[in-house]
Swiss-Prot record:
The keyword rRNA-binding does not apply. It comes from the Bacteria. This is Ribosome maturation factor RimM. The keyword rRNA processing applies. It is found in: Cytoplasm. One of its GO terms (biological process) is ribosomal small subunit biogenesis. Keywords: Chaperone, Cytoplasm, Ribosome biogenesis, rRNA processing.
Length: 172
């Protein structure tokens, strides 16, 4: 399964640097000089491999220079490109209470009382912590803080998450 680890937002400057939204918990390990990235263009087309020349932080994004991307026009052509990795390449997680986002997405969510809540559509990473965006069958979405006081259990084997929501959380 392909996982998105970054997305090209725009060109930065005139020398071909790219402003990239990072979507990995290991940016220092994944976005380093010499690393090879697999890119999928936003507007279709064939995937390509890119070699990183340099990386630097810029606010909440990274500025990345790729081999062969030497000016603003070449960088603009990559706008929207998704950088991907195969989930099989990810190292196993040793902590039983930690999960990769893709492991949680698609899981069924129910309360400790057995009431179905919905399915995890996305894991959101915020400054305050992680949130599970849970979508019900009608398409309504509720955000559930991914904290032990609310998320009682996660079963990869059963593809299920059990929550004990505080009063009113599911009514928002």
């Amino acid at each position: 399964m392909d996982l998105v680890v970054g997305r090209v937002v725009k060109a930065h400057g005139v020398t071909g640097e790219l402003a990239v939204d990072v979507r990995t918990d290991d940016p220092e390990g994944r976005f380093v000089a010499g690393a090879v990235l697999r890119g999928r263009p936003a507007r279709g087309g064939a995937e390509r491999e890119f070699v990183i020349e340099s990386v630097r932080s810029h606010g909440d994004r990274m500025l990345i220079r790729l081999q062969g991307v030497g000016d603003r026009d070449a960088a603009d052509a990559l706008r929207g490109t998704l950088f991907l990795v195969d989930s099989a390449e990810l190292p196993p997680i040793e902590d039983p209470d930690e999960f990769y986002d893709h492991q949680l997405e698609g899981m069924a969510v129910s309360t400790t009382g057995g009431q179905p809540v919905g399915t995890v559509a996305e894991v959101l990473h915020t400054a305050a912590g992680e949130l599970l965006a849970v979508r019900d069958p009608d398409g309504a979405e509720v955000l559930v803080p991914f904290v032990s006081a609310i998320v009682v259990s996660v079963s990869l084997a059963d593809n299920a998450i059990e929550i004990d929501p505080p009063e009113g959380l599911l009514d928002l």
